[in-house]
């Protein structure tokens, strides 16, 4: 072991592992972690927003620990694994002389640092990207059947981590088009497809909900150079912190001397260019480009080994980065260290305040898939995120969580109220109000399907009831939400629908009723889409229909 990994390397790796464990234990969850913890309460082959790997890791962690570490333990393990694999991917024999430089380089990469203890889909994405590159490198040197099989399994694991993983596989393939004639490469693809088939089946059974949301239904906004394209370049700087100059310098200086280096360059440039083009359509989130951290770490470390000037400055700035990031990690635990409130601050406090007033009564959070799992994690009580026309669908829209609150006394929390039976305060000072409701009932899974008008402006509306019980039509009120071309809701109007059969008073279980309607004229100009929603029992209308593009 010490022949491959120097003693100093193993010592620093152990220190890093302990640091991440301590950090993971004392840092409160961020909202996305709470949401993925909610995933893990019911393991499945897929979820609304992401493939299931993050939920699987959280489930494994929960077998070993309770609390925050029960969410994060496997992230700490995978982080160590990523460091080990990256070290193995460095061929330069002089690397043993620069162990400290190696750790400073990786520790300075801000998001890689954070994903050393936070559990998000990008955590396994980083690990399996590194492992995929290691297997691909071995495949280039010795393309055996077993290497192909293992590579196929890892390709599937990549895709189970996050859909962005397709970019890793695509750009590595583009760097070596001869793979298309390599039967061992096709074996890897076949193994990957077989391993990934349960998720394909889940997508099919759930009407490809994840793909449709990410590609078509996700709201956008008007293009802004500052927010979109310039913001993207800021993100490219932010992921490498103070070492960004030397990381990109190493990328520019590296020449494609072999197929593996060519793969690293194609992967890095490919992802950067892909999201640069995407930035003209929508805002690119920082973590979307995190996968370039793996190939650039290899390129940057090889560069610093051979370039004394870069090595000197990367070492100096790496120490500064380490100090800054350690202080930032302390601030994640202890908020007074900086005058900024972050997601890891005060969650236990607001949950405790709300729980003291609501007791064991389930809480329904309107339009908040973030607050609902956070409250459930720290209180242990049932929650539900009720989504309406001003929000978006999420995991609560497709699972059975609605049944946990049906016909029960609940507390309904919404940011739209200015008074209520109880209040609680978020760490940022925002006051939320909640009201008690008896015998709560919602029908958020009713489906509204709009058919194109055959004559003039009359549309056909099909309303499908997926529930195991019948629903009285008198409880349902219809609305149409108009949105701009970016799918941002701007106006909502009550909708009059006419049933095809006037004798129908019940929407039976697993049945569909047909209605006719004419679109009311909106006040807004430049409308792009409309969406039909159903308001039941006095609630705001839901997301029962899909956005329908209006013809000009």
Language model segments and positions:
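Extracytoplasmic catalytic/substrate-binding loops of multi-pass membrane glycan-assembly enzymes
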Residues: 24-36, 45-57, 65-69, 206-209, ...
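Membrane-interface alpha helices of multi-pass inner-membrane proteins
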Residues: 42, 135, 146-162, 174, ...
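Transmembrane-helix motifs of polytopic, lipid-linked glycan transferases
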Residues: 73-95, 108, 131
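Membrane-interface transmembrane helices that cradle and orient dolichyl/undecaprenyl
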Residues: 92-96, 132-147
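Short helix- or helix-capping micro-motifs
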Residues: 102-110, 155
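Short acidic/glycine- and proline-prone juxtamembrane loop motifs at membrane-interface regions
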Residues: 114-125
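Transmembrane-lumen/periplasm boundary regions of multi-pass, lipid-linked membrane glycan transferases
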Residues: 157, 167-261, 276
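Membrane-proximal, lumen/periplasm-facing interface regions of secretory-pathway glyco-
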Residues: 311-360, 368-389, 412-416
């Amino acid at each position: 072991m010490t022949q491959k990994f120097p003693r100093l390397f193993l010592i620093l790796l152990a220190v890093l592992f302990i640091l991440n464990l301590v950090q993971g234990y004392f840092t409160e969850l961020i909202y996305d972690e709470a949401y993925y913890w909610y995933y893990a309460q019911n393991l499945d082959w897929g979820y609304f927003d992401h493939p299931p790997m993050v939920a699987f890791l959280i489930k494994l962690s929960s077998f070993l620990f309770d609390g925050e570490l029960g969410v994060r333990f496997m992230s700490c393990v995978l982080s160590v694994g990523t460091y080990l694999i990256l070290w193995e991917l460095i061929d330069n024999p002089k690397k043993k002389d620069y162990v400290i430089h190696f750790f400073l380089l990786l520790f300075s990469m801000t998001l890689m640092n954070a994903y050393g203890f936070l559990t998000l889909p990008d955590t396994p994405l980083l690990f399996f990207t590194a492992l995929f590159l290691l297997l691909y490198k071995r495949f280039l040197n010795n393309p055996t059947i077993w290497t192909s099989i293992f590579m196929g399994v890892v390709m599937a694991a990549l895709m189970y981590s996050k859909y962005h993983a397709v970019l890793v596989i695509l750009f590595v393939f583009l760097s070596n088009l001869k793979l298309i004639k390599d039967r061992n490469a096709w074996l890897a693809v076949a193994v990957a497809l077989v391993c990934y088939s349960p998720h394909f089946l889940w997508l099919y059974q759930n009407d490809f909900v994840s793909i449709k949301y990410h590609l078509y239904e996700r709201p956008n906004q008007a293009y802004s150079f500052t927010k979109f394209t310039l913001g993207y370049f800021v993100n490219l700087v932010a992921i490498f912190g103070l070492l960004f100059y030397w990381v990109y310098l190493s990328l520019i200086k590296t020449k494609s001397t072999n197929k593996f280096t060519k793969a690293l360059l194609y992967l890095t440039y490919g992802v950067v260019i892909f999201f640069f083009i995407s930035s003209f359509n929508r805002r690119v989130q920082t973590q979307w480009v995190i996968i370039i951290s793996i190939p650039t770490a290899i390129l940057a470390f090889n560069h610093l080994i051979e370039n004394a000037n870069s090595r000197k400055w990367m070492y100096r700035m790496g120490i500064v980065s380490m100090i800054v990031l350690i202080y930032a990690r302390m601030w994640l635990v202890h908020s007074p260290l900086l005058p900024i409130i972050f997601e890891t601050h005060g969650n236990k406090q607001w949950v405790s305040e709300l729980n003291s007033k609501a007791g064991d009564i389930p809480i329904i959070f309107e339009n908040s898939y973030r607050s609902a799992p956070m409250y459930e994690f720290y209180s242990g009580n049932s929650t539900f995120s009720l989504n309406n026309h001003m929000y978006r669908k999420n995991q609560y829209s497709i699972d059975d969580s609605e049944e946990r609150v049906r016909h029960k006394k609940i507390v309904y929390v919404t940011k739209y109220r200015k008074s209520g039976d109880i209040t609680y305060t978020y760490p940022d000072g925002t006051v939320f109000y909640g009201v008690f409701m008896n015998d709560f009932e919602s029908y958020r899974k009713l489906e509204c399907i709009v058919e194109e008008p055959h004559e003039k402006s009359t549309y056909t509306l099909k309303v499908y009831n997926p529930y195991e019980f019948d629903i009285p039509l008198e409880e349902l009120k219809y609305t149409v939400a108009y949105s701009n071309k970016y799918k941002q809701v701007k106006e909502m109007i009550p909708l009059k629908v006419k049933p095809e059969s006037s004798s129908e008073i019940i929407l039976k279980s697993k049945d569909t009723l047909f209605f006719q309607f004419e679109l009311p004229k909106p006040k807004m100009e430049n409308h792009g889409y409309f969406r039909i929603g159903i308001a039941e029992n006095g609630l705001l209308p839901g997301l029962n229909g899909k956005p329908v593009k209006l013809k000009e």
